[in-house]
C-alpha cells in the first residue's frame, strides 16, 4: 500500500524542489519515499515548480501554513489588519487574538461588511494564512501544558464553620426549601439575590511584559478579583459590588473608591467580609424600615452567624440550582468589563504606548463598577422570572390550573345558563301553540318560527361544542408550555443530565427511540382494550363511573404533594424519586397530547 495522500504547504513543496535540484543523480522514487509522498505528487510538484516558488516568496513566513492560493472572502479586510499587526509588532508590542478580533470588527465596520463576525474559526484561518505564529502559539502551548481538571465535587449540605459560629442559629432557613416558596410574602423590591464571581485584571500587563514565560510556556494571569454582586428581584436596586483581592487596599482618590474593597491572602470574599457586608445591609434596611430576603448562591459553602440580623433574612439555594444572576447577569458584567479593557488596550496599541497597557487596581475597580451599572434592570428581572420568581415556572403551574372551588363555580354558572335556556324554550313553545290555534296564516308563521328556533338551538349546541374543544386544547397547550419551560430552564425534564436520562429505562421507553414500532403496537392494543372497556361499561348499567382527572387537576394535585413532601428534611433518594415522577408525568402528557392532536387531525380529514 502506497503512502497516504496529504496536502503539503508551500514551504514543504519548496524543500522537495530543493532536494531534487541538489541531488540530480538521485532517483525520483527514492526522493518520494524520503518525503513519504506518492511519485505522482512529486511529478506534479516539479511540474508546477515556478508557481510554487513564487508563492513561497509571496507569503514569506506564512508559507509554512498556507497550502493553496485561495483568497479569503474578506481579503481586503485581512490586508488592512495584517498591515496594522505588522506595524504594532515592529514597535515591539505583542498582540493577543482577542485584540485582533476587536480590530477586525472595527475595520469591517469602516468597510461596511455587515456580515463579518470575527469568529474563532476565521481568526484561526487568518493566523494560518498570514503566519501569525506568535498568537496561535499561546493556544498550542496552553493545550500542551494544561492538565485535565478534576471533576467537581458534588455540592452537599456541609458548610465550612466560621469563627464564633455555633452550629445552627436562629433565622436560618434550610437548604431543602425552594427559593420561590421562601420568597412568598415579600414584595419584589424586597427579594435580593447575591452571587460571587471572578475577574482578572492583569490581562493588559501580561501583554506588556510578553505572553511567554522563561520556560517557553504561556503565562497565565495571576491577579484575580472576587466580586460579590447583589440585586433585587425587579432590578430597581443594585447594591455596590464587594470586591476582594490579594493586593493591599489602594489609596482612595479624591472621589473615593467606586466600590467596597477588601484584601486577604487568597483573594476571595471571606466569611468576615461577608458578615460585615450583611451587617451594613441590615443597618440600611433598618433605617428604611424594610425587611428583606437575601438568597445566597455560591455563598452557601460559608457558615454565618445571622443572629444579629433583624431586617435581613438569609436563605440558601438548593444544591444544583442555577442562581438567578447566573442566568445572564454575571455574563453581562464580564462582557462589559472585558470590553472596557479591550478599549484601553486598543488605544495603547494604536498610540504605541507600552505604559498604557498597564492596568492598576483602582482602574480595575472603576471598570467593575461601570460594568455593573451597565446591566439593565429589565435584564435582572428577566433572569429572576426564568429562575421561577414571579411569572416563572412556579407561577405558570399555580395560575394555569384552576382550583376545585373555581371549577365548581364554573359548573354552577353553566347549569344556571342551561336552566335559563330551557325556560326560554318552554315559553317559546307555549307561544307556538297559541299561534297554531289561531290557524291559517298563524300556522305558517308558527312553522317558520319553529324552523328558526331549531336552527338557533343547533347553532348554540355547535358553539358549546367548540368552546369545550377550545378549553381542552388550551389546557393541553398550557401543559405543553409548562413542559417546554422546564426543558428550557434546566436543559432537561426535572433537571436531569444526559447520563441520568440514559440510566432511566422508563424515560427511554417514553421517549420512543429504537422501540418506536413496539410503541405503535402497544398503542393499538391499548386502543382495543379501551374499546372493550367502553362496551363493558355500557353493558353494566349498575356500575359506578370513575371520573378521569384532567392534566391540570393531576398536576395541581402533584404540586400539592410535592410541596408537602419537600417541607420536610428528606434525603437525596426521596428527592430523586419525586423528580423521576415529575419527569414521567411530563413525558406521558406530551405523548398523550401528540396522540390527541393526531386523532383530531384525522377527524378533520375524514
From Swiss-Prot:
The modification Phosphoserine is found at residue 165. Pfam families: CENP-B_dimeris (PF09026), CENP-B_N (PF04218), DDE_1 (PF03184), HTH_Tnp_Tc5 (PF03221). GO terms for molecular function: chromatin binding; DNA binding. GO terms for cellular component: chromosome, centromeric region; nucleus. The modification N,N,N-trimethylglycine is found at residue 2. Residues 144-163 have a biased composition (Low complexity). Residues 2-52 form the HTH psq-type domain. There is a cross-link at residue 246 (Glycyl lysine isopeptide (Lys-Gly) (interchain with G-Cter in SUMO2)). Residues 65-136 form the HTH CENPB-type domain. Poly-ADP-ribosylated by PARP1. Antiparallel homodimer. Interacts with CENPT. Identified in a centromere complex containing histones H2A, H2B and H4, and at least CENPA, CENPB, CENPC, CENPT, CENPN, HJURP, SUPT16H, SSRP1 and RSF1. This is Major centromere autoantigen B. The gene is CENPB.
Amino acid at each position: 500500500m502506497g503512502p497516504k495522500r496529504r496536502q503539503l504547504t508551500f514551504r514543504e513543496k519548496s524543500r522537495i524542489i530543493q532536494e531534487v535540484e541538489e541531488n540530480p543523480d538521485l532517483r525520483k522514487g527514492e526522493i518520494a519515499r524520503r518525503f513519504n509522498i506518492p511519485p505522482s505528487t512529486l511529478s506534479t510538484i516539479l511540474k508546477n515548480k515556478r508557481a510554487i516558488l513564487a508563492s513561497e516568496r509571496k507569503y514569506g513566513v506564512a508559507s509554512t501554513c498556507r497550502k493553496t492560493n485561495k483568497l479569503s472572502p474578506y481579503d481586503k479586510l485581512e490586508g488592512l489588519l495584517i498591515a496594522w499587526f505588522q506595524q504594532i509588532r515592529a514597535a515591539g508590542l505583542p498582540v493577543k487574538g482577542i485584540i485582533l478580533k476587536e480590530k477586525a470588527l472595527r475595520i469591517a465596520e469602516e468597510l461596511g461588511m455587515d456580515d463579518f463576525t470575527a469568529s474563532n474559526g476565521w481568526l484561526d484561518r487568518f493566523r494560518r494564512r498570514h503566519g501569525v505564529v506568535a498568537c496561535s502559539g499561546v493556544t498550542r502551548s496552553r493545550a500542551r501544558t494544561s492538565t485535565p481538571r478534576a471533576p467537581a465535587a458534588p455540592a452537599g449540605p456541609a458548610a465550612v464553620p466560621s469563627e464564633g459560629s455555633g452550629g445552627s442559629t436562629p433565622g436560618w432557613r434550610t437548604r431543602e426549601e425552594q427559593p420561590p416558596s421562601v420568597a412568598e410574602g415579600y414584595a419584589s423590591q424586597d427579594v435580593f439575590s447575591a452571587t460571587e464571581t471572578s475577574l482578572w485584571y492583569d490581562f493588559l500587563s501580561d501583554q506588556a511584559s510578553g505572553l511567554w514565560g522563561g520556560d517557553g510556556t504561556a503565562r497565565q494571569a495571576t491577579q484575580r478579583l472576587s466580586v460579590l454582586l447583589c440585586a433585587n428581584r425587579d432590578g430597581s436596586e443594585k447594591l455596590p459590588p464587594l470586591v476582594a483581592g490579594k493586593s493591599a487596599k489602594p489609596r482612595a482618590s479624591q472621589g473615593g473608591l467606586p466600590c467596597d474593597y477588601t484584601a486577604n491572602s487568597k483573594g476571595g470574599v471571606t466569611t468576615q467580609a461577608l458578615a460585615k457586608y450583611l451587617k451594613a445591609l441590615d443597618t440600611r434596611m433598618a433605617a428604611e424600615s424594610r425587611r428583606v430576603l437575601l438568597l445566597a448562591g455560591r455563598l452557601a459553602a460559608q457558615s454565618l452567624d445571622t443572629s444579629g440580623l433583624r431586617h435581613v433574612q438569609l436563605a440558601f439555594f438548593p444544591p444544583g440550582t442555577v442562581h438567578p444572576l447566573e442566568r445572564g447577569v454575571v455574563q453581562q458584567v464580564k462582557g462589559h468589563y472585558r470590553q472596557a479593557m479591550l478599549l484601553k488596550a486598543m488605544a495603547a496599541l494604536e498610540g504605541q504606548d507600552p505604559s498604557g497597557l498597564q492596568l492598576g487596581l483602582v482602574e480595575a475597580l472603576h471598570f467593575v463598577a461601570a460594568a455593573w451599572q451597565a446591566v439593565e434592570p429589565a435584564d435582572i428581572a428577566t433572569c429572576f422570572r426564568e429562575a421561577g420568581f414571579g411569572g416563572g415556572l412556579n407561577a405558570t403551574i399555580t395560575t394555569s390550573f384552576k382550583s376545585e372551588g373555581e371549577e365548581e363555580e364554573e359548573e354552577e354558572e353553566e347549569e344556571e345558563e342551561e336552566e335559563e335556556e330551557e325556560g326560554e324554550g318552554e315559553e317559546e313553545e307555549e307561544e307556538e301553540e297559541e299561534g297554531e290555534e289561531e290557524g291559517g296564516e298563524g300556522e305558517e308563521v308558527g312553522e317558520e318560527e319553529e324552523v328558526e328556533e331549531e336552527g338557533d338551538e343547533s347553532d348554540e349546541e355547535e358553539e358549546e361544542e367548540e368552546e369545550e374543544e377550545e378549553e381542552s386544547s388550551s389546557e393541553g397547550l398550557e401543559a405543553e408550555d409548562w413542559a417546554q419551560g422546564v426543558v428550557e430552564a434546566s436543559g432537561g425534564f426535572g433537571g436531569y443530565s444526559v447520563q441520568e436520562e440514559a440510566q432511566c429505562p422508563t424515560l427511554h421507553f417514553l421517549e420512543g427511540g429504537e422501540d418506536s414500532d413496539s410503541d405503535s403496537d402497544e398503542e393499538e392494543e391499548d386502543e382495543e382494550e379501551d374499546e372493550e372497556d367502553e362496551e363493558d361499561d355500557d353493558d353494566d348499567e349498575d356500575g359506578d363511573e370513575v371520573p378521569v382527572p384532567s392534566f391540570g387537576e393531576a398536576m395541581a394535585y402533584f404540586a400539592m404533594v410535592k410541596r408537602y413532601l419537600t417541607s420536610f428534611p428528606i434525603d437525596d433518594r426521596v428527592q430523586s424519586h419525586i423528580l423521576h415522577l415529575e419527569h414521567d408525568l411530563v413525558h406521558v402528557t406530551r405523548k398523550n397530547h401528540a396522540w390527541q392532536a393526531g386523532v383530531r387531525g384525522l377527524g378533520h380529514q375524514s
